[in-house]
Amino acid sequence: MSVVDEETRRKILEDWESNPMRKPRVGKVTVNIGVGESGDRLQKAYELLQELTGQKPVYTRAKQTNPSFGIRRGQPIGVKVDLRREQAIEFLDWTLDAVDRELHESQFDEFGNVCFGLEEHIALEGVEYDPEIGIFGMDIAVTLERPGFRVMRRRRCRRPVPRRHRLTKEEGIVFMEEEFDVEVLP
């Protein structure tokens, strides 16, 4: 039982078959660990993310001062890393296994992108608990795009991508169900 009705699904799949430039792909996967404080715990999150992804993370900084949480504006409070191409697809496949390949319709935005979280990094297959590091949760954001989206990001001759070439929520759901064998729950 899918969230997208069969008629809409059929139209979307026919559209992708007739024009390969309309078939979506994974643009990037962003993995974020929000620690909420700087110091030793943030450094451990940095090392964990580097170990899980094989890439060097960047620190995310506080946007504003909040004395009740003990953070100042500009202070590093989290780490994130962007994965692209094959590395992104492999990591996404690995993390989807940790959530039993189930996503909710509310996790998709209007442009077909999807975000989900892991409460504990040890839910990932092959990752063991290390008392030195502790347990961290993480957010995984998947950005879907069609071929040709570079037009709106490139430096020269930048142009907007028309509404008809952007992804919809339904297309994002169908793509995740078809490519990653995900069950989308209402």
From Swiss-Prot:
Keywords: Ribonucleoprotein, Ribosomal protein, RNA-binding, rRNA-binding, tRNA-binding. The keyword Ribonucleoprotein applies. Pfam families: Ribosomal_L5, Ribosomal_L5_C. It comes from the Archaea. GO terms for biological process: translation. One of its GO terms (cellular component) is ribonucleoprotein complex. PANTHER family: 60S RIBOSOMAL PROTEIN L11-RELATED. NCBIfam families: PRK04219.1. HAMAP family: Ribosomal_uL5_A (MF_01333_A). This is one of the proteins that bind and probably mediate the attachment of the 5S RNA into the large ribosomal subunit, where it forms part of the central protuberance. In the 70S ribosome it contacts protein S13 of the 30S subunit (bridge B1b), connecting the 2 subunits; this bridge is implicated in subunit movement. May contact the P site tRNA; the 5S rRNA and some of its associated proteins might help stabilize positioning of ribosome-bound tRNAs. Part of the 50S ribosomal subunit; contacts the 5S rRNA and probably tRNA. Forms a bridge to the 30S subunit in the 70S ribosome. Belongs to the universal ribosomal protein uL5 family. This is Large ribosomal subunit protein uL5.
